[in-house]
Amino acid sequence: MPALMVVGCTSHAGKSLITAAICRLLRRQGWRVAPFKGQNMALNAYVTASGGEIGYAQAFQAWAAGVEPTIEMNPILLKPQGDMTSQVVLKGRAVGRTLAERYYQDYFEVGWEAICEALEQLQADYDWIVCEGAGSPAEINLKHRDLTNLRVAKHLQAPTLLLVDIDRGGSFAHLIGTLELLDPDERSLIRGFVFNKFRGRRELLQSGLDWLEERTGIPVLGVIPWIDRAFPSEDSLDLMERRRRKTQAEVTIAVIRLPRIANFTDFDPLESEPSVQVRYVGLQDELGYPDAVILPGSKTTISDLLDLQRSGLAQAIRDYAAAGGTVLGICGGFQMMGQHILDLEGTEGIEGQFEGLHLFPTQTWFTAEKTLRQRQTTARSPQAGLPITGYEIHQGQTRLDSDSEEFLPIFDDPKLGLCDRNGNLWGTYLHGIFDNGAWRRAWLNSLRHRRGLKALPTSIGHYQAQRDDLIDALADAVEPYLNLSPLLTAL
């Protein structure tokens, strides 16, 4: 069946977004398209309808293709936990932790088998597969055990686009160097070059493009301009670049940039609000006095909690809350807000009982069992009756110490989260909570009320519609500058 692959000379070349754009462009032509990434290393994850865990980037690409995300689209997900260890998620399920030096010894064979099984299923279900590589396909020390780049392209005999980030400089050297390091059978799969993130006029680049085509015999199929839109990021390093100030912002929200922050795509809907300035605060930064503080999810909640305490930021958050500030915790952040976290089995690698922030009268117990599921519920606060969707990804269960009337469930299912009666403290296990437009606006209005600001309308839809518009804008921005015709005609 037809398949394309996108690989990059480096990490952060833009592979994920270009893959998403191609998925949307093929969908517009009437094809049923599946994205695929054999192995992804990321802390942003999504739970499929079947209860499996995949990288959020592959879920985003599936939405670009207009299909439901499935575990076959990302059969191996590695979730870094620090100290050169990662949790291994195989076919949607966590199967253990591994050291980097042990991973390929323990998982290479079973991983390649999972990749082949996933591709076979996708070939049966879809017209096209658009594959994304990882990092660079030319890492000499890793090529013999690379599961996700040109091994996949060779398996599918997929024509491959080699993508380079021209904004970094050295793009011609990157392209030529990558080609030189590929084996002949790998090099034969490279059918086109794509320059990404170009700022300037193409005619100033043309002499270099002509030289490249003459030198390699491979056509340049795209020179894609810099796209100045806020698309989902896979790497927390990208958060450091999100410093754009909104002149019309009336509310400021500080998201704590934990060392192992996870699922920070939760905040894309907040960043889409023109009146909201989202500021990512590192452990060495001043908290200040924003309108709200959010403690996000974490892949290693205990380690991040200890780092938060050592930095002094934990005390700053407690002082902020004591002064009447609003604090919201999601998943690991919710767990941190309690009295204690107990990990008696060393699920995260550190055994013991650990002091939380003492903002909620809750205790959290970690167990080896991981909760993975999509959820539908109804809100009780800040506005009752709102339909809510989201998903859970967590290890551990949280219990309220007492039947205190000071704390109320946020949703019909009280296990999903709680808040205090004053609306200052919020905690939930639900990822994607801000995707629910009416709930997001109701929560923001509680912050605006304290500032004496006019309430925002709450009769808005789910963020899914905005995300789809964003994907359309991405495809519209890419289409004039990416010539897929030679590949599509050949296939």
Swiss-Prot record:
Give the GATase cobBQ-type domain ranges: 250-439
Which keywords appear in this protein's UniProt record, sorted alphabetically? Cobalamin biosynthesis, Glutamine amidotransferase
InterPro entries named among the record's database cross-references: Class_I_gatase-like, CobQ/CobB/MinD/ParA_Nub-bd_dom, CobQ_GATase1, CobQ_N, CobQ_synth, GATase_3, P-loop_NTPase
Asked if Coiled coil is a keyword of the record, the answer is: no
Which pathway does the protein contribute to?
Answer: Cofactor biosynthesis; adenosylcobalamin biosynthesis
Taxonomically, which superkingdom? Bacteria
List GO BP terms, alphabetically: cobalamin biosynthetic process
Q: Write down the Pfam families for this protein, in alphabetical order.
A: CbiA, GATase_3
Active site, UniProt feature: 331, 431
What does the record give under GO molecular function?
A: ABC-type vitamin B12 transporter activity; catalytic activity
Q: What does this protein do?
A: Catalyzes amidations at positions B, D, E, and G on adenosylcobyrinic A,C-diamide. NH(2) groups are provided by glutamine, and one molecule of ATP is hydrogenolyzed for each amidation.
Q: Which family does it belong to?
A: Belongs to the CobB/CobQ family. CobQ subfamily.
Matches recorded under HAMAP family: CobQ
Q: Which NCBIfam families match?
A: cobQ, PRK00784.1
Q: What is this protein called?
A: Cobyric acid synthase
